[in-house]
Curated annotation (Swiss-Prot):
SMART domains per UniProt: ELFV_dehydrog
Protein name: NADP-specific glutamate dehydrogenase
InterPro entries attached to this UniProt entry: Aminoacid_DH-like_N_sf, Glu/Leu/Phe/Val/Trp_DH, Glu/Leu/Phe/Val/Trp_DH_C, Glu/Leu/Phe/Val/Trp_DH_dimer, Glu/Leu/Phe/Val_DH_AS, Glu_DH, Glu_Leu_Phe_Val_DH, NAD(P)-bd_dom_sf
PROSITE patterns assigned to the protein according to its UniProt record, in alphabetical order: GLFV_DEHYDROGENASE
Gene Ontology BP terms: glutamate biosynthetic process
Tagged with keyword ATP-binding: no
A molecular function (GO) term: glutamate dehydrogenase (NADP+) activity
Subunit structure: Homohexamer.
Keyword check for NADP: yes
Organism annotation: Fusarium fujikuroi
Transmembrane annotation, as ranges: none
Gene3D superfamilies: Glutamate Dehydrogenase, chain A, domain 3 (1.10.285.10), Leucine Dehydrogenase, chain A, domain 1 (3.40.50.10860), NAD(P)-binding Rossmann-like Domain (3.40.50.720)
Amino acid sequence: MSHLPQEPEFEQAYGELASALENSSLFNEHPEYRTALAVAAIPERVIQFRVVWNDDKGNLQVNRGYRVQFNGALGPYKGGLRFHPSVNLSILKFLGFEQIFKNALTGLNMGGGKGGADFDPKGKSDAEIRRFCQAFMTELSKHIGAETDVPAGDIGVGGREIGYLFGAYRKFANRWEGVLTGKGLSWGGSLIRPEATGYGLVYYVEYMLKHANRGTFEGKRVALSGSGNVAQYAALKIIELGGSVVSLSDSKGALVAKEGSSFTPEQIHNIAALKIKHQALTTFEHDGQFTWIEGARPWVHVGKVDIALPSATQNEVSKEEAQALVDAGAFIVAEGSNMGCTAEAIDVFEAHRKEKGAEALWYAPGKASNCGGVAVSGLEMAQNSQRIQWTEKEVDDRLKAIMKDAFVAGLETAQKYVEAKEGELPSLIAGSNIAGFIKVAEAMHDQGDWF
């Protein structure tokens, strides 16, 4: 890929997958899969467009919009829209590439894609966000559809933005269809969708705890990063299951519980209310049981923890922070964010897993541990196609089953293709990457995408 412009985030995601495949027996047993990897690494389609809109003062503003339709072998392209000033093609290609294999692990018929714009919703009025969403959908509507490409939300795109985008699509297309997921409950949304990524992450970790003979969440100290949708609902589910959440964070710093303290459900709800208004964690009011650490992530400040769940953004756990978690006695790290750990951090975790046997820290990659969000998006698509709405229990039960299947797929594939010593925990990063890749590669081969 040396003749291409530098795309560090995408190259990291590609490197993680390629490394997992190379360091297993897969290519020895199936050398033809090297061809599949070369083909799968190139998006089927990249759409880039300008978005022109007016701010509240009547001034013209322009942003870049994107949709990467990476792989449609398993179903319609599926993946979120991100509105954030950092958005560029490399980040969206990385997210879209990860999405292909994450969606494969859900067992649902969904391809992989990702999109967004370098628009910053922070500090914008409701009217400005509405006008931007309408302008963005003017172009995007030409490229999506319920059987073609079904976007969802991501950073900067919540229920309000999905509503504006869906309304604009409906006007342009003159039809109602399940073209977006994350919709409101009264107009085609699914119960459990807002909670799905956070809940699914916790369900996945429950299977890890059980397999590693580490009990349940009861009495466990859990470090979380982020304070958005994923972190909020993961925290609430952990507390419900008897665990203690001892940290949250945002782009300005980390909020860490003092000795003997942890977050309550009421405090999590208060933080959620702040985040809806795009307010920082610095505005959160408490009685002194938390320490605010400016400009920091929580990992080196949380003290002894059992479980760490990075749930903010990519590359939020460095090599040094990974070592700090090992030293703090953590025995599970599972990503709620996409590619939450740097490659060097993963090396630390994997080296510990190989060295310490059953007592090791066990790491789970986001494409497996956070696939609950897109899984329930897929369930929303299924409900839309039938014009029905399942109960909360029906959706939650299906989510638990999907997370179990994703865990088992990674576990069993690792046991099949990755050499391990007696008593060593299987490599979930290798197993999940290989399991997702095989499913996509076989579908592509059947459809003539490689031969």
